[in-house]
Amino acid sequence: MRPMASKEAQLEALLYAAGDDGLETDNLLQLLEISPSALRELANHLKDRLKNDENSGLQLICINHTYKLTTSAECGDVISKFFQKDLSKNLSQSALEILSIIAYRQPITRVEIDDLRGVNSSGALQTLVWRGLIKVNGKKDVPGHPNLYVTTDYFLQYFNYESLADLPVIEEFEADDNPVNLFDQDEQNSKEINFDEGE
């Protein structure tokens, strides 16, 4: 039987899974079943471990009682280079799928996106933020106060739309199972994606 992961390992895993939204203190206390002082001790130890590990490109931050794992400042240049060097490069299938969901359902939280897709969207969501195609626009008034994501003006520019009204109407695709092609494949090298509007 596999031994139980340490509380610090659990904290690290939770913050990784939470992605860009991070996790508020109260949520972590409930999930880890520890006291506030124990959480502070765990967080400080994890923060120091990541900071002192020259082979780690991550850091732990806490803003407004919300803990997040982010890339370290030392890796800032290469991260910026990765996300910004070639915006004409094809977006991944998952990124396009997330982008379509946000375009039609905005404002929307990461958890709501995950529920629609059935998988974790943190990585692709962060890529879209870095590329300037989506942004955080406030927080939802529910427990945990998750970030709300919307598309940006650059999203319209990038995909050659004048407004969101130019997006294909979902009803046009409900009569069959054809994939929804949200973006101009010839000009933007985008892919066809299946988009389930849900109920």
From Swiss-Prot:
Keywords assigned: Cell cycle, Cell division, Chromosome partition, Cytoplasm
GO cellular component: cytoplasm
Listed InterPro entries: ScpB_csome_segregation (IPR005234), WH-like_DNA-bd_sf (IPR036388), WH_DNA-bd_sf (IPR036390)
Superkingdom to which the source organism belongs: Bacteria
GO biological process: cell division; chromosome separation; DNA replication
Subcellular location: Cytoplasm
PANTHER family reported in the protein's UniProt record: SEGREGATION AND CONDENSATION PROTEIN B
Record note on quaternary structure: Homodimer. Homodimerization may be required to stabilize the binding of ScpA to the Smc head domains. Component of a cohesin-like complex composed of ScpA, ScpB and the Smc homodimer, in which ScpA and ScpB bind to the head domain of Smc. The presence of the three proteins is required for the association of the complex with DNA.
Function text: Participates in chromosomal partition during cell division. May act via the formation of a condensin-like complex containing Smc and ScpA that pull DNA away from mid-cell into both cell halves.
Family note: Belongs to the ScpB family.
Protein name, as recorded: Segregation and condensation protein B
Species annotation: Lactobacillus gasseri (strain ATCC 33323 / DSM 20243 / BCRC 14619 / CIP 102991 / JCM 1131 / KCTC 3163 / NCIMB 11718 / NCTC 13722 / AM63)
